[in-house]
Amino acid sequence: MTQMEYIPIISDSTSSFKSYDPFPLELGGELPELKIAYRTWGTLNAQKSNVILVCHALTGNADADSWWRGMFGEGKAFDETKDFIICSNVIGSCYGSTGPLSLNPKSGKRYGPDFPRITIRDMVAAQRLLLQSFGIEKIKLVIGASLGGMQVLEWGAMYPEMAGALMPMGISGRHSAWCIAQSEAQRQAIAADAEWQGGWYDPAQQPRKGLAAARMMAMCTYRCFENYEERFGREQREDGLFEAESYMRHQGDKLVGRFDANTYITLTRAMDMHDLGRGRESYEAALGAFTMPVEILSIDSDILYPKQEQEELARLIPGSRLLFLDEPYGHDAFLIDTDTVSRMACEFKRQLIVDN
């Protein structure tokens, strides 16, 4: 599968930012050139003070109005009548930004497994370049969950002068051994597929079984025991499959039709490197240096990023506020109960106005 084949999935409203200057990477090396796919909603005001930056999760893209639809609308978290909302596809992904499916200008061939190791900090540095192209010097609110929440926190550490307020959801300040183990198991599922070929597979014949298995494993951590029991129980279909089995297979097949195996490995490895304290004085000092308003959303039923991790963030970030989403949906609750998440974000935005 080539990047061109993803175009039908990408909205016609998607724009591209291109930089032909070498883009240095945190772990060494560089990208010879950079392309960032992004979308915007609303109008940037004259003061450029109404910017909301939305950061997407692992398999997301710039089409935030599709995967986070319930957050958009007048009077909601992302109000196009008042806000200028921007969401970019992270580098390393496969929805229009530079990633493993892109052509390496030095070789004329796709990067594939030779795509350089990237980090969350590289993603944020690329987003900053995009915002600077608009002349934006201050972001009213940076918001996101999961991988998006990692980006939100790094905005606070890397560019505190730009990040006016942060709302990270369902995330920790450093990737746990539990999460790293989950990601490695998923990567090994991909590598076990005979079509993997060390990552040099034909793009039209990627390791579908391995990628589907990786997605199924991930889906077990995106929900929770109560959710699966209530939704599926021990119900069986006419073909003999348990409903839970059928759901897993459906989720695996669905991802294979819209994602790339090398991309999955690139992004999960970037997540493994997530640690606000890495290369800084200490983890505690990095979070303790935050001075902007921060509202942390924790999901009670999240087994991937359990609430003690958000409680730790709240203890270490001065003046931060911790909210709980009490829903039996697991980690994915931020995508499901958008009414509550939007209401919390709106209240945070109103408080920012009062405080200013």
Curated annotation (Swiss-Prot):
Highest taxon of the lineage: Bacteria
This protein's pathway: Amino-acid biosynthesis; L-methionine biosynthesis via de novo pathway; O-acetyl-L-homoserine from L-homoserine: step 1/1
GO molecular function: homoserine O-acetyltransferase activity
Stretches assigned to the AB hydrolase-1 domain: 50-335
Primary location: cytoplasm
One Pfam family in the UniProt entry: Abhydrolase_1
A cellular component term, taken from the record's GO annotations: cytoplasm
Example GO biological process: methionine biosynthetic process
Catalytic residue positions: 146 (nucleophile), 302, 331
Cellular location(s): Cytoplasm
Keyword line: Acyltransferase, Amino-acid biosynthesis, Cytoplasm, Methionine biosynthesis, Transferase
Residues holding substrate: 215, 332
Enzyme Commission identifier(s): 2.3.1.31
Reaction it catalyzes: L-homoserine + acetyl-CoA = O-acetyl-L-homoserine + CoA
General function of this protein: Transfers an acetyl group from acetyl-CoA to L-homoserine, forming acetyl-L-homoserine.
Quaternary structure and partners: Homodimer.
HAMAP family: MetX_acyltransf
Alphabetical list of NCBIfam families matching this protein: homoserO_Ac_trn, PRK00175.1
Family, as annotated: Belongs to the AB hydrolase superfamily. MetX family.
Record protein name field: Homoserine O-acetyltransferase
Organism: Chlorobaculum parvum (strain DSM 263 / NCIMB 8327) (Chlorobium vibrioforme subsp. thiosulfatophilum)
